[in-house]
Swiss-Prot record:
<feature type="modified residue" description="Phosphothreonine">
    <location>
        <position position="606"/>
    </location>
</feature>
<dbReference type="GO" id="GO:0008285">
    <property type="term" value="P:negative regulation of cell population proliferation"/>
</dbReference>
<dbReference type="GO" id="GO:0003713">
    <property type="term" value="F:transcription coactivator activity"/>
</dbReference>
<keyword id="KW-0963">Cytoplasm</keyword>
<dbReference type="InterPro" id="IPR011993">
    <property type="entry name" value="PH-like_dom_sf"/>
</dbReference>
<dbReference type="InterPro" id="IPR026088">
    <property type="entry name" value="Niban-like"/>
</dbReference>
<feature type="lipid moiety-binding region" description="N-myristoyl glycine">
    <location>
        <position position="2"/>
    </location>
</feature>
<feature type="modified residue" description="Phosphoserine">
    <location>
        <position position="609"/>
    </location>
</feature>
<feature type="modified residue" description="Phosphoserine">
    <location>
        <position position="681"/>
    </location>
</feature>
<feature type="region of interest" description="Disordered">
    <location>
        <begin position="590"/>
        <end position="746"/>
    </location>
</feature>
<dbReference type="GO" id="GO:0005654">
    <property type="term" value="C:nucleoplasm"/>
</dbReference>
<dbReference type="GO" id="GO:0045893">
    <property type="term" value="P:positive regulation of DNA-templated transcription"/>
</dbReference>
<dbReference type="GO" id="GO:0005829">
    <property type="term" value="C:cytosol"/>
</dbReference>
<feature type="compositionally biased region" description="Low complexity">
    <location>
        <begin position="671"/>
        <end position="693"/>
    </location>
</feature>
<keyword id="KW-0519">Myristate</keyword>
<dbReference type="GO" id="GO:0045296">
    <property type="term" value="F:cadherin binding"/>
</dbReference>
<dbReference type="GO" id="GO:0032274">
    <property type="term" value="P:gonadotropin secretion"/>
</dbReference>
Amino acid sequence: MGDVLSTHLDDARRQHIAEKTGKILTEFLQFYEDQYGVALFNSMRHEIEGTGLPQAQLLWRKVPLDERIVFSGNLFQHQEDSKKWRNRFSLVPHNYGLVLYENKAAYERQVPPRAVINSAGYKILTSVDQYLELIGNSLPGTTAKSGSAPILKCPTQFPLILWHPYARHYYFCMMTEAEQDKWQAVLQDCIRHCNNGIPEDSKVEGPAFTDAIRMYRQSKELYGTWEMLCGNEVQILSNLVMEELGPELKAELGPRLKGKPQERQRQWIQISDAVYHMVYEQAKARFEEVLSKVQQVQPAMQAVIRTDMDQIITSKEHLASKIRAFILPKAEVCVRNHVQPYIPSILEALMVPTSQGFTEVRDVFFKEVTDMNLNVINEGGIDKLGEYMEKLSRLAYHPLKMQSCYEKMESLRLDGLQQRFDVSSTSVFKQRAQIHMREQMDNAVYTFETLLHQELGKGPTKEELCKSIQRVLERVLKKYDYDSSSVRKRFFREALLQISIPFLLKKLAPTCKSELPRFQELIFEDFARFILVENTYEEVVLQTVMKDILQAVKEAAVQRKHNLYRDSMVMHNSDPNLHLLAEGAPIDWGEEYSNSGGGGSPSPSTPESATLSEKRRRAKQVVSVVQDEEVGLPFEASPESPPPASPDGVTEIRGLLAQGLRPESPPPAGPLLNGAPAGESPQPKAAPEASSPPASPLQHLLPGKAVDLGPPKPSDQETGEQVSSPSSHPALHTTTEDSAGVQTEF
């Protein structure tokens, strides 16, 4: 590899790449500085005027469920240096960075991991043929001849390949189709989370960055959705540079690569990965510099906005009226002829899979709570409630149980519309809807937790507890139905705008864009940082199509075809005290109701200091969300689970459950039991805390560089394969069985 890079990436070419990258970054960062003032003004105006959106009925977690392991297990990884397949112990922590260890024993001994992979921008491929086709298309002229050895050979029929257009690729395989499906769901969850790298609560920096990306690409005549808007700001910036730099390098270096087609493909992957990380480091330094600069002047900008808010609004409205008078006739004709006829078909294509997915979320939540209720009746009441509720609290982050919800969106098709509206891929809409599903599931679970915790304060008996769970479930489902409708309608409106606005801007650009500079004189110089002609122009274009979009969504709600509430149905203060309950400390179900005999407080004989110490110890525990219920790989030793016990609970209450908790739609086909000990292996206790050296500052290292550091604490700022600095976490067990120390080689 070193010879390839030294040959094709010598000092002169590296200097050229750095200069080209710097030029692109300088141009983009000017857009970012311009958009920062606009985003700051919009944020402060939003705080004063409000959103106008319906009030959510469900609660949301203010303290996230950190310190958990989403998944752990074994899989084979292809080693590029030795060209061999090795068995690796892998786990996914709460930040969704895939961590690969030599084996489980290495993990328990806190040996540094082999790799930490941030999967933003990656795609999962489930066949070698798919991969070879993509590789052949990425570097023309390198398609291998029939019968020749491909770039990759998989020893089983169940591969999983992580493919990225610029960074290195990762090759895994499993022994069974069931394992492949399981890991595909887990890795897809990692990609979904890592792609959503810009924080949702970023009200200024986030919108400023995404608007700057859009404005920069439009300045290059690139409209429509962009698949590589994935990851955090630095990763997205790196993708932006590579979008322009990659084809240039490919044209220069492609003809110079030597060897068979497979070898040239391998060389190009190595070169592209090296360039990508050069760009990443340069983009990171430049972006942090500019971000620090705009944040330093933010207080002064806020002072101007607070003082002159009314004048800024008046000036912007005056500018908008002038632009509207100029473009409205052209925009209305364009909307009427090219957009309006297609809105119903686009909306229908979006509504069907999205509504099916949200219905599945409701069904999964219903079944999990119902199963928990039956388990409470049959197996110990409040004594087991803490264990069951801890599992339920993590339901939204269980990739396998949520998979039936997510996969509904995979049927989304915009056939015939993608080319017309320049929609390169539907993946951006699929992932956005899936993120909404996870959020609504977590909101429903958290609201259920909060209401049930209030009921438990009354000291109910087992029968009363069952009825309380039923009543709380019914309340939460009503709130979920309302919030689900609101979230879906907002998603439909945003998706329709995301499809139609770039199309309209592209259509209007030849006749309108060149005339925009003359409107600049209408903006007072003092307000020029908060009002931009381009942004105001886009808002006017948006308004011309917005009324048609709102009308289409309103008509869909009136039809009640997809269980959408009408806009006139508003639930005001249906639970006025509910939001007050959410202001308290997070509920620790394991602490309050684990073997407490129904009591929610520590034993009187337990010293307070010991209780606090126990809480601190528990806070460090890494709890696996996913408990492996299937047979392990052939090289694993899995203990057999006892056969499920036959429920013998209270007949009357079971009848109540059957009558009162029947969902409107059929439950999922697969078993989704929560808290049934017969179906899940018991979770082992955490190993005692081991002494470890003081943690060093977290280092963001480049992919592919092995560094002997401590156990991983993956960062969302990473890109590709990385290894993190030592952490003070103890070695903790997860629930997936594996054979520690086994090295299997094909």
